[in-house]
Amino acid sequence: MALRGSHRLEVIFKRCIASPVLHSHAANRRSSQLAIKEGDPNSNGNSGQYQQNGEQKEKGWRRLVRFFVPFSLGAVVSAAIIQREDLTPTIAASKMTGRRRDFNFIADVVAGCADSVVYIEIKDTRHFDYFSGQPITASNGSGFIIEQNGLILTNAHVVINKPHTMVQVRLSDGRTFPATIEDVDQTSDLATLRIQVNNLSVMRLGKSSTLRSGEWVVALGSPLALSNTVTAGVISSTQRASQELGLRNRDINYLQTDAAITFGNSGGPLVNLDGEAIGVNSMKVTAGISFAIPIDYVKVFLERAAEKRKKGSAYKTGYPVKRYMGITMLTLTPDILFELKSRSQNMPSNLTHGVLVWKVIVGSPAHSGGLQPGDIVTHINKKEIKNSSDVYDALADNSKTLDIVILRGVKQMHVTITPEDP
């Protein structure tokens, strides 16, 4: 459009250039003829004078044309550029609108399955809020609905080994219900809860065996008690053995992902792009390294739990309940140590083993004693701690208190904890 406009102006300018010349020649001819008809003796000389005047006028017109034409052409070019700049954002915006619609696959996944994700609160029945008079929240986690009649799947560490507490579940629509623990398997860190509600949105279960490294996944849950939180990433590994993570008595190949899984995400679903749960969010080591229990392993737990319920007994396996300290921990394997040292300059270079404290329950003995997430336990009661089994053994001792040596950054510190009896 701008080019057509510039072409029209060019034609007009050519006509303007030609018309002054024609006009001056016609004027000269008319003046010469008038002089001859009147019989002026100096008519020949006057006609030459008129011709000179015409030539001067012609030169003047040419000067004006030469002066105005560049400005006019510059205006045309500027108008074309401005018009093109005006059109460019419109075209880009239309393309971006289509791109947003075509590539917003994470939002499509969330829209299809977020209603089945729940927020789980563990209420301390011994301590009450000063203003509301309600039990305070000792810890929290996530879960997701697997049956319309109120059966919820979560991690065992979210709901058990917490004396003097009660469990509450908040749905995505804000409704809150008390929950009862039905099935527990501490070995696999899985548990089911029941709330007395029907016609709930159910999460579809996929197949973790078909996953590939690099596949997109979405983690749903309530990190740091922030309900309905969505993070996304890819599957980093489909076969991360529990032995690599220093987890005792667990024959599980975990799913490793770089999707952010923070405190409170535990028990929530790890979902594929078809909106199917392919894992249960379990733990985080550091930013970009988190783990989930494969859904194929979870299905075995659910089948056994259903058989037990048909027989009238709950499905409970795992270790005997020991004294309660209130932490979630992870053994520092060589691979994990290497990753931590590469991400943090505060890690001592001579550290070769220990246990990482990655969660501390508020109000627990560990919290009261001063343990913090990120601390590394190296000794308990003067015994070297190499893995999480050593911590369990220390809890099984008859010692009333635990004198714990920790590394916090580059500083070595001592804390004293008095575990609670079961």
Swiss-Prot record:
Its EC number is 3.4.21.108. Residues 1-17 form a transit peptide. One of its GO terms (biological process) is apoptotic process. The chain crosses the membrane at residues 64-82. Disulfide bonds: none annotated. A motif (IAP-binding) lies at residues 75-78, 94-97. It is a single-pass membrane protein. The active site is at H157 (charge relay system), D189 (charge relay system), S266 (charge relay system). Serine protease that shows proteolytic activity against a non-specific substrate beta-casein. Promotes or induces cell death either by direct binding to and inhibition of BIRC proteins (also called inhibitor of apoptosis proteins, IAPs), leading to an increase in caspase activity, or by a BIRC inhibition-independent, caspase-independent and serine protease activity-dependent mechanism. Can antagonize antiapoptotic activity of th/Diap1 by directly inducing the degradation of th/Diap1. Belongs to the peptidase S1C family. This is Serine protease HTRA2, mitochondrial. It comes from Drosophila melanogaster. The lineage of its organism: Eukaryota, Metazoa, Ecdysozoa, Arthropoda, Hexapoda.
